[in-house]
């Protein structure tokens, strides 16, 4: 066999992977991101009405931060979606522990324990953003074929809005998002939607993405071969803050109207970034063209982030199919 | 003189009104409506840099709810923009009084006292809404010629977004909004903008409206005659709540995609109102066609309001000019 043919054969060969036990669908990790809150409540209503058989695979539904949901706030004491690193999950709990640290450890026991063999196969954590990001799937690894195949599937099936994949690509123990507790999975961001508001159009897109994820897992477990190919992903590079008053730290400018709502565009040196409150334009000074995202996300003002920047690259994923007694 | 001619003469005659002492521009009455917060801060920066002469009339700037602004929340204890009725303003203050009741009484002493001769001539209270309401001027009286003339002026001058006038038309003593403290004035609503976010496009529109208000007062005080004519206004009729679960009171539906973002359209019997979280459409059952506004406003979920309904009517305002020694 020539080298070329061997490579071709290698490309075509399926990677055999274990069947997936099911999925945990989590909403309200941030209590004021309402599409996920109402979707989880709707799924729980469906289960009550029609029993577990409503889905073809085991589905766990979780309202992640019930106290924040009740108060319609992002969080009570601290951002829970920064509490799922190994370090925070192993912090001893005391009377003064933030509510979200306690709740994160509870969720880790329910869905994990992170890093152990018993963790959930997949978490799909539902979020909204005030940014015009369409449907964005965020996850931690550039080599998790199951997750990347689901992303690819959603990209093929959802046509109403752009579906993009964002890879953070840092060690899983340092990963601080809820979905990092499970073997596979992703954060599902849908926007634009204001905090404390549910928009039917955004809710419908989120529901379609969750239904398709369940659909993919069912098909995979049933033996469907998912063909490999290229997946275009965005990789986080750096964050950019708003211009601020050096003394008060108050913002002195807003995102420029020419950048607002243009998440994932190609931002080049000289392009407008900010419009100051007195009317001056601040332009981009980056040497390399990059893709901005989470542009003017409401929750990031306090984090000192006006937007993130990403680089686009292409991942090649192999074909995958479920491991059976014969294939194992 | 015939009756017709007398009527004609009456129409043409100017109403002479006292010069206006200035305007109070208030932002952050709701702490997470950021355009007004940043506009007031910018005006204060300009005054610091260039002195009081920066405006041709006396301008007072007020950050109405500084604690809520600091926490980026609508309010701390209670909605302050419901605290300016005579009843709440005269409630005795105790240790357990809500922060906003105390602050409303402070503001009433600063800008009022409501109902007395010493009140500010005009308050312009800056707000944002998550609804697609463009620029909406809200005020209490259908016969306040000064305010209606400023509305008319803004309608003529601002072309980027629709400028609409909403009249609540109930007794001034019961009126609970901050602007009701002054002789004239209005609440200036600009949207759509998420809570906790400032969008440059929305900020620029709000700034233009405030600049034009100052401009109108200056021209009026300088003797300009403002010609009378018709002003189209919307009058509040009733509120409509979301469909809710009878037990939990949770929402069971969101505003329908065909209604979302269509504030001030004409809503007729049979038009879609809501889309339930399981996919069913709820339609309008009103006998009379009406105009919905504040559609899906984030702050109104807790108030049990999915949208308000209004009726459109036309007000005829007379020409106005400033009272001088000669004319008085």
Curated annotation (Swiss-Prot), chains A, B:
Enzyme class per UniProt: hydrolase
Documented EC number(s): 3.5.1.114
Residues reported in the UniProt entry to bind substrate: 74, 81-82, 189, 300
Cofactor: Zn(2+)
SUPFAM superfamilies, A to Z: Zn-dependent exopeptidases
Predominant localisation class: membrane
GO molecular-function term, one example from the UniProt record: metal ion binding
PANTHER family assigned: ASPARTOACYLASE, N-ACYL-AROMATIC-L-AMINO ACID AMIDOHYDROLASE (CARBOXYLATE-FORMING)
Family listed: Belongs to the AspA/AstE family. Aspartoacylase subfamily.
NCBIfam families: PRK02259.1
Name recorded for this polypeptide: N-acyl-aromatic-L-amino acid amidohydrolase (carboxylate-forming) A
UniProt source species: Danio rerio
Gene: acy3.1
């Amino acid at each position: 066999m020539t080298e070329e043919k061997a490579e071709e054969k290698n490309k075509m060969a399926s990677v055999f992977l274990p069947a997936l036990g099911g999925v945990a669908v989590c909403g309200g990790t941030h209590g004021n991101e309402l599409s996920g809150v109402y979707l989880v409540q709707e799924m729980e209503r469906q289960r009550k009405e029609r029993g577990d058989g409503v889905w073809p695979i085991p589905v766990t539904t979780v309202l992640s931060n019930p106290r924040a949901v009740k108060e319609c706030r992002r969080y009570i004491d601290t951002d829970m979606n920064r509490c799922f690193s190994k370090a925070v999950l192993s912090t001893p709990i005391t009377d003064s522990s933030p509510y979200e640290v306690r709740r994160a450890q509870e969720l880790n026991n329910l869905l994990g324990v992170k890093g152990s063999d018993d963790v959930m196969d997949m978490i799909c954590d539902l979020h909204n953003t005030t940014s015009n990001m369409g449907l964005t799937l965020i996850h931690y690894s550039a080599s998790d074929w199951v997750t990347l195949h689901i992303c690819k599937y959603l990209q093929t099936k959802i046509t109403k809005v752009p579906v993009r994949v964002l890879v953070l690509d840092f060690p899983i123990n340092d990963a601080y998002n809820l979905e990092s507790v499970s073997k596979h999975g992703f954060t599902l961001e849908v926007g634009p939607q204001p905090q404390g508001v549910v928009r039917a159009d955004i809710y419908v897109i989120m529901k379609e993405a969750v239904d398709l994820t369940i659909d993919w897992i069912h098909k995979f477990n049933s033996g469907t071969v998912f063909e490999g190919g290229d997946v275009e992903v965005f990789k986080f590079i750096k964050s950019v803050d708003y211009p601020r008053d050096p003394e008060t730290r108050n913002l002195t400018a807003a995102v420029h109207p020419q950048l607002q709502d243009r998440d994932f565009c190609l931002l080049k040196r000289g392009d407008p970034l900010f419009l100051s409150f007195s009317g001056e334009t601040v332009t981009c000074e980056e040497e390399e063209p990059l893709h901005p995202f989470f542009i003017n996300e409401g929750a990031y003002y306090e984090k000192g982030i006006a937007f993130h920047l990403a680089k686009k690259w292409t991942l090649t994923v192999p074909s995958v199919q479920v491991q059976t007694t014969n294939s194992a």
